[in-house]
Amino acid sequence: MFGVGIDIIEIDRIRKSYQTYGDRFLKKIFTEGERVYCFSKSNPYASLAARFAAKEAVAKALGTGIGKLLKWKEIEMRRDSRQPQVVVPEALLCSLGVKRVLLSVSHSREYATAVAIAE
């Protein structure tokens, strides 16, 4: 195992950020596919918060944080199956010696959380 990352966020924080900054906030953090998926849900803020937590958890598991080596939109969470899939630049994974990143996300009424394992 290379690293483990975990994150938790209040769903209301994402809602307030969207209400304050609008699409500018969304376009900085989330890919177009993530935005489309989340706004197709009955509670888009819970889905957005889960993806935000996932991005933070992945960055922690890789040990890069969000910044020079890894940008927000370079981490994309997809729902191709029942299990969430995470897409990260292959070149970065190779340079770190990471073969894959596993991801688990969940949310309640107030919080979203994610755990990432880099192997």
Curated annotation (Swiss-Prot):
GO terms for biological process: fatty acid biosynthetic process. It is found in: Cytoplasm. The keyword Metal-binding applies. Its main location: cytoplasm. Its cofactor is Mg(2+). Its EC number is 2.7.8.7. InterPro entries: 4-PPantetheinyl_Trfase_dom (IPR008278), 4-PPantetheinyl_Trfase_dom_sf (IPR037143), ACPS (IPR002582), Ppantetheine-prot_Trfase_dom (IPR004568). Keywords: Cytoplasm, Fatty acid biosynthesis, Fatty acid metabolism, Lipid biosynthesis, Lipid metabolism, Magnesium, Metal-binding, Transferase. It catalyses: apo-[ACP] + CoA = holo-[ACP] + adenosine 3',5'-bisphosphate + H(+). The keyword Cytoplasm applies. GO terms for molecular function: holo-[acyl-carrier-protein] synthase activity; magnesium ion binding. Mg(2+) binds at D7, E56. GO terms for cellular component: cytoplasm. It is an enzyme of class 2 (transferase). Transfers the 4'-phosphopantetheine moiety from coenzyme A to a Ser of acyl-carrier-protein. Belongs to the P-Pant transferase superfamily. AcpS family. This is Holo-[acyl-carrier-protein] synthase.
